[in-house]
Structures are given as C-alpha cells and as structure tokens.
Amino acid sequence: MPFGWGRGRGRRRKRRMIGFLPQVRHFYPAIPPVSIRQPPIIMTYEEFEALRLVDYEGLTQEEAGKRMGVSRGTLWRALTSARKKVAQMLVEGRELIILPQGNEVVSDEE
C-alpha cells in the first residue's frame, strides 16, 4: 500500500529521517518475571532514533529534530515516549520490540 494510504481519517504522517537502523530489535529479560506474562512493549524506529540522537549522540532536541526532519515538539514527544518505554521495560522486566511504522526514510546524513 502506498505511503499515507489506508490510515483512515486525519492527516498523513510526515516522513521521518532515520540515520541508523537498530541492529538488535528485540530485547527480553534473561530471567522472565514469575508474575503473569505481560505483552511486549513496542517502540517505533522514530522513538528509537530520537533516543539515539539525544541521549546517545548528545544532540540537542533542536538539532535532533532537524536531522529527523521534524519539529522540536514532535521530537520531544517521541523522545519522552521512548524514555518511558525503556524505563517500563527495565522496571517491569518486559520485552521490548523495535518496529518500523512505514513512514521512515533511511538517510546516510550523519
């Protein structure tokens, strides 16, 4: 299906520039928790890239937003969501799976 089709109502999602595809896309606890198994946490490539640029590369939110082709506010929302998901994974001992949304464009601009 072409980009932007079949999403229903609302605006089309803007393309996100991704500079690095994660080599490992599935994280799980070495020792599963004894409690009832919870569903995995799903992180998007957009959230992963925001986390990588700001927390790993040390870019400002403004610089990271420009690199991804989004506003600082959009970058902030993706970064906040990614940080929450990582914390949830660590605290609750849940699986984390990183998946594309279909609106990412891999760029070699570093």
From Swiss-Prot:
NCBIfam families noted in UniProt: PRK04217.1
Protein name (Swiss-Prot/TrEMBL): UPF0251 protein PYRAB12660
Annotated SUPFAM superfamilies: Sigma3 and sigma4 domains of RNA polymerase sigma factors
Gene3D superfamilies: Winged helix-like DNA-binding domain superfamily/Winged helix DNA-binding domain
Similarity remark: Belongs to the UPF0251 family.
Database matches in PANTHER family: PTHR37478, UPF0251 PROTEIN TK0562
Organism in which the protein naturally occurs: Pyrococcus abyssi (strain GE5 / Orsay)
Alphabetized InterPro entries for the sequence: RNA_pol_sigma_r3/r4-like, UPF0251, WH-like_DNA-bd_sf
